[in-house]
Amino acid sequence: MAKEKFDRSKEHANIGTIGHVDHGKTTLTAAIATVLAKNGDSVAQSYDMIDNAPEEKERGITINTSHIEYQTDKRHYAHVDCPGHADYVKNMITGAAQMDGGILVVSAADGPMPQTREHILLSRNVGVPALVVFLNKVDMVDDEELLELVEMEVRDLLSEYDFPGDDVPVIAGSALKALEGDAQYEEKILELMEAVDTYIPTPERDSDKPFMMPVEDVFSITGRGTVATGRVERGQIKVGEEVEIIGLHDTSKTTVTGVEMFRKLLDYAEAGDNIGALLRGVAREDVQRGQVLAAPGSITPHTEFKAEVYVLSKDEGGRHTPFFSNYRPQFYFRTTDVTGVVHLPEGTEMVMPGDNVEMTVELIAPIAIEDGTRFSIREGGRTVGSGVVTEIIK
C-alpha cells in the first residue's frame, strides 16, 4: 500500500488528554478518532489499541504513550494519551510529546480529583498554552445542579493555576456513549473538537521563531576563520546576519559570513538543518560547545532558575537513594554539562527516586535559558533526572 502524502495545507497541532485516572481519557481519545472517522477525517481506533501503549525511551526514561492522528476541517492533530499517571508526569517534563494544548477530562460523577489538580499544575509549569475541558460521564449524573457545581469547581481550579477559568470552553458529554454510536453524544464530541479548533491557538512553527543554534563543535579553517557547527533549533539564519554567542562567558556579537551544510554553501539555514556557521572575527577559543548562537536579544544567559523535575526511579537506571537540598549534580543543557546546586522547596525534606518536584537551581556558570528550556540532571555521565525551566530568577 502506498503511503499517503502528508497534507501540509492544514495547520498542524499536537494535543493530549490529561486528567485523573479512570475519568475517561483513553475512552475519549478513542471516541474522538471514531466519531471523526465517520466524517472521513480519521481512522477509527479501538480503546484497546490506544490503551496498550508502546514503551518509548526519551532521555533514558521509559514512558508509555499512545500517539494517534486525526483531522478536523480546520486542522491535522497528533494526539497523545498516556495510560498511567507516572507516564503523564514524565511525558510533560521531558517534553517527549510536546503539547500545543490539552483536553482536561473530568468525570462529572466524581468532580476534580488529586491528579486533576496535578495535571493542571504540570500543564501550567511546562507551558501548555491552553486547555479545553470535557466533563465526561454526564449520563451517570441525573442532577443538573450537580453538573453545574462540578463545572464551577473545575473553572475555579483552572483559575487557581493561572488558566483563564471563566473563559475556558467546557463541553459536557459521555465518551463511552459516543464510542457506542449514540448520536446525541457523538454531537458532543464534534462540539468538543470545534472548541479545540477555535480555542487552542495555532502553534508558532519553529522556523518562524528567533534564530538559535546550540554549538556542538568548533574548528578553524585556515584563511577563512572559525566555524561553529550544530543543529539549528529554531528560526533561520542568513549569510550576513548578526548573532550573539551566549553562555559560559560574557555574551559577544559576531556576523555569520558563511553557512555550510553537507559541504555545500547556502544562503540561509532554518530549524532542523545541521550546519557549520562561519563567524567573522572570532578566535577558535572564543566559542565553545555548550554556548548558543542566537538572534541578538532573543535569549539571555542565567544562573538561577526554578524548575519542575522528574527524578528517575532505580528501575530506570536512576539513583538508588534520595537527595537533599545542596545536592550538586551536573545539569545538561542542549550540548553541555554545568554543575549546579539544588535547593528544595520549604517543607520538602528530600526527593526520592521516581518523584517529581519543583526546585530552585543555581548554576556555577551562566547558560542561555528561558521558560520552557529542557535539561537533564546527570551524575558522572548517567542521567538521574529530567527537568524543565519554569521561572528565571537571575
From Swiss-Prot:
GO cellular component, one term: cytoplasm
Positions that bind Mg(2+): T26
Region (G1): 19-26
Subcellular location: Cytoplasm
Residues that, per the record, bind GTP: 19-26, 81-85, 136-139
Top EC class of this enzyme: hydrolase
Keyword annotations from UniProtKB, A to Z: Cytoplasm, Elongation factor, GTP-binding, Hydrolase, Magnesium, Metal-binding, Nucleotide-binding, Protein biosynthesis
Main location: cytoplasm
Classification via Pfam families: GTP_EFTU, GTP_EFTU_D2, GTP_EFTU_D3
Family: Belongs to the TRAFAC class translation factor GTPase superfamily. Classic translation factor GTPase family. EF-Tu/EF-1A subfamily.
Alphabetical list of HAMAP family matching this protein: EF_Tu_B (MF_00118_B)
Function: GTP hydrolase that promotes the GTP-dependent binding of aminoacyl-tRNA to the A-site of ribosomes during protein biosynthesis.
The protein's name in its UniProt record: Elongation factor Tu
